[in-house]
Amino acid sequence: MEMAYTELNAKLCAFLDRTPNSFFAVKNIKEELAAAGFAELQENSRWQLQEGGKYYVSRNGSALLAFVIPQKDYLGFQVYACHCDSPAFKLKNNAEIVVDKKYVKLNVEKYGGMLLNTWLDRPLSVAGRVLCNVDGRLEARLVNVEQDLMMIPNLAIHMNREANEGVKLNAQTDMLPLIGSAATKDGLQKLLAEACGVTAEQIVDTELFLYNRMPATTVGLEQEYVAGGRLDDLQCVFAGLQGFMAAEAGESVPVFCMLDNEEVGSGTKQGAAATFLKDALQRINMALGRDEEDYLVSLANSLMLSADNAHAVHPNHTDKNDLTNKTYPNEGVVVKYSANQKYTTDAVSGALVQLLAKKANVPLQLFYNRSDMAGGSTLGNISTAQVAIKSVDIGLAQLAMHSAYEMAGVKDTAYLAELAQAFFTAAVAEAADGTYCLK
């Protein structure tokens, strides 16, 4: 089992390193699915589905949904929902700023709830989507500048004697990255054009995000922790995909759903508040010749795991967690509860996931926020507003959430992969007498 943890987390680290943002998450997972025999569907074309077929569809190049059809008379849907975006700096248009005729820095803005100080004094680069005018047609091309390209330098303590007493960082004035000397003006545009195989004049628009170039790795005396950028939520993405690829579909349709823009509220066409999941489930139903009544019945026999990482007890701040429900790295998948419904877990869905975990021999931990702290939000309750199915919020316990370099447990990646595999193989049936059966 230790070897399995080691191998799996080596793959996780490689996935983190080649996935700087949501566009590359979709690209990389598409490649894995295609290699495994999945057929790509288009939202702007009719779907032709068959029993035993394996399919995937994407939206905006930054959200993806994959599924397998076990049989035409399937019972329901087993939906694993996660998100592929992470807090980062986004590059503004007209980004170059020349300082004192000596430096070139870049104008950026915050995406999501960032820990700003963690972005200082690290090698950074830029990746994302570039829209190019090629013979009158707009083409989207993905770009990842795989070099140590820029850095946001700290102000020396000699010029800021109060630095260790707490400094408030301003995103507009303190956090603009230095990319080169004044002699390199317009250099980024030229670099992007070269990467896209076009001229600088052919670049029409961009969606580019900064990312930390430090490779993901394992740390600890026994290498028991994994550290890297974007563990929230790519650890759940990776583990869920492993379970999805390994599972054999049972009586329900296994659905792997990876959404975008969770870190900024999910209110986009590719986010949890949109109809991407709902549209796909309805189209599966229609393509197999089932009617609206069949669809509603299948929803009643469905279950969703909303997978988004959770807060581990911090060794230097143990008072920040709940008094009786504490979560730690390497001690199992976290099940989240919230009285104000920020998390979707209720007694029914919580009991179902406990039965599922017991069957898969996967340990669970329970998470509540402190009663005097609001905590963060996630995508589960937003998704179920569009698709009303039983849902449970889960995740993996991590430290340094929303840092440029995060930390979690190596065992937990395997625990979630095993739970996801069992989940995708299972089916949930709700009887007329109000009882539930996990098949």
What would you call each of these model-derived segments?
Residues 1-439:
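N-terminal hydrophobic/helix-forming segments and targeting peptides
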